[in-house]
């Protein structure tokens, strides 16, 4: 127990199913065993691995190497974990950027559709306003035409009455003289025109004007002769 360093023989057992070596209850992979073999000094027979079976090392050295290899494996696992986390974060950022671009594209499309809808609505309002103005103007022109036709009809009625009155006066004054109807041809034409254009008497205004001029001229001539 004094000055001699104690050594213990440790047997490496292989797991046939998983290629795992068990050292004193610790399961080591083949990669860990290979690295432990490579890091062992080549001159020391007590610390060399000659094969998977029958190799012996000191207990303390074995614990140290196992701890180092486990720490290395843990570091590699942590590094791989961090790498995968980084990939996941990068993928999430890419997915978020793609979603943002898609959202913006959909928003632009909605804005464009809304602008087109507003333009179409504005154009429809303009067309409705133009149609309303045209209907109003049409009603105004029809009203003016009706008034002109009414005035023309009244004018014809007054002229006819005046002519009849003048004719009666002349007949009473000059009974002994034989006379013929004044402006008979124009009277016939204007009567015929009014019969043919009962809804558009304004078209006979030119004949009515000629007829009135003819009647006035006849009256003046009769008065001059009678005087």
Swiss-Prot record:
Topological type in the membrane: Lipid-anchor
Compartments it resides in: Mitochondrion inner membrane; Cytoplasm; Nucleus; Mitochondrion
Protein name: MICOS complex subunit Mic19
PROSITE patterns in the record: CHCH (PS51808)
Residue interval(s) of motif Cx9C motif 1: 183-193
Modified residues (Phosphotyrosine): 49
Oligomer and partners: Component of the mitochondrial contact site and cristae organizing system (MICOS) complex, composed of at least MICOS10/MIC10, CHCHD3/MIC19, CHCHD6/MIC25, APOOL/MIC27, IMMT/MIC60, APOO/MIC23/MIC26 and MICOS13/MIC13. This complex was also known under the names MINOS or MitOS complex. The MICOS complex associates with mitochondrial outer membrane proteins SAMM50, MTX1 and MTX2 (together described as components of the mitochondrial outer membrane sorting assembly machinery (SAM) complex) and DNAJC11, mitochondrial inner membrane protein TMEM11 and with HSPA9.
Alphabetized UniProt keyword annotations: Acetylation, Cytoplasm, Disulfide bond, Lipoprotein, Membrane, Mitochondrion, Mitochondrion inner membrane, Myristate, Nucleus, Phosphoprotein, Repressor, Transcription, Transcription regulation
Bias-annotated ranges (Polar residues): 39-50
Major site of localization recorded for this protein: mitochondrion
A GO molecular-function annotation: molecular adaptor activity
Chain ranges of the CHCH domain: 180-222
Domain of life according to the entry: Eukaryota
Disulfide bonds: 183-214, 193-204
Residue positions of covalent lipid attachment, annotated as N-myristoyl glycine: 2
Cellular component, GO, one term: mitochondrion
GO BP, one annotated term: cristae formation
UniProt similarity note: Belongs to the MICOS complex subunit Mic19 family. Metazoan Mic19 subfamily.
Motif Cx9C motif 2 boundaries: 204-214
Function, as annotated: Component of the MICOS complex, a large protein complex of the mitochondrial inner membrane that plays crucial roles in the maintenance of crista junctions, inner membrane architecture, and formation of contact sites to the outer membrane. Has also been shown to function as a transcription factor which binds to the BAG1 promoter and represses BAG1 transcription. Plays an important role in the maintenance of the MICOS complex stability and the mitochondrial cristae morphology.
Positions where N6-acetyllysine occurs in the chain: 142
Region ranges (Disordered): 32-57, 73-92
Pfam families: MIC19_MIC25
Residues carrying Phosphoserine: 29, 50-51, 56, 58
